[in-house]
């Protein structure tokens, strides 16, 4: 937040809110695991925070397109539909069609915008690569969590979660490099 205000940067401020939202969901989930030894039984508390973070990451991508219209691309549309379909099939945020549908719509839109940028610029920006990788890791984390029941020892779940966190951290340097292009 301090960096966002020092630079008067909308993109840094949006990223800070995205980080804060993701951190709140993760903190709730981890405290529940540490204190009680199992995943939360009150569903969608952490998921709502994580969902808010993806809305902020979507806002960053929309900020990139501010004043421009993404070109229509059948490839980008297909990528968005496939990612949304995978999220719905795997039910990343649990059995609720509402939460899984909201995440599927958000991930599909993010994928569409990222691949539209690929069509426009003939390359993906580093932030978009990290964002697509982060979405893949979020899906993988849910799939892995279906097979892990013992959270007391280091497992594949924690390896994927650490990689997901490091990918989130990588957003900041990518955004700072694009700062001259930030429309503020």
Model-identified regions with their sequence ranges:
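Generic intrinsically disordered, low-complexity segments enriched for polar/acidic and small residues
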Residues: 16-19, 26, 51, 104, ...
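Hydrophobic alpha-helical transmembrane segments of multi-pass membrane proteins
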Residues: 1, 11-35, 47-54, 82-83, ...
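Hydrophobic, aromatic-enriched alpha-helical segments typical of multi-pass transmembrane helices
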Residues: 17, 48-59, 77, 93-108
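Internal transmembrane alpha-helix with an interfacial aromatic "cap," most often the third helix
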Residues: 1-8, 30-77, 114-115, 171-179
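C-terminal transmembrane-bundle signature of multipass membrane proteins
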Residues: 110-184
């Amino acid at each position: 937040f301090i960096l966002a205000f020092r630079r008067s940067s909308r993109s840094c401020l949006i990223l800070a809110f995205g980080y804060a939202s993701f951190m709140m969901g993760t903190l709730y989930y981890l405290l529940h695991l540490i204190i009680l030894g199992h995943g939360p039984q009150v569903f969608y508390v952490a998921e709502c925070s994580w969902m808010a973070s993806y809305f902020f990451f979507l806002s960053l991508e929309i900020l990139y397109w501010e004043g421009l219209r993404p070109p229509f691309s059948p490839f980008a549309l297909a990528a968005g539909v496939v990612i949304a379909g995978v999220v719905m099939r795997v039910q990343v945020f649990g059995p609720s069609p509402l939460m899984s549908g909201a995440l599927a719509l958000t991930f599909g839109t993010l994928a569409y915008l990222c691949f539209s940028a690929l069509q426009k610029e003939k390359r993906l920006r580093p932030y978009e690569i990290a964002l697509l990788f982060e979405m893949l890791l979020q899906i993988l984390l849910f799939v892995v969590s279906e097979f892990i029941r013992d959270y007391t020892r280091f497992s594949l779940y924690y390896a994927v979660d650490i990689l997901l966190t490091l990918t989130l951290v990588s957003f900041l340097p990518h955004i700072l490099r694009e700062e001259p292009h930030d429309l503020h």
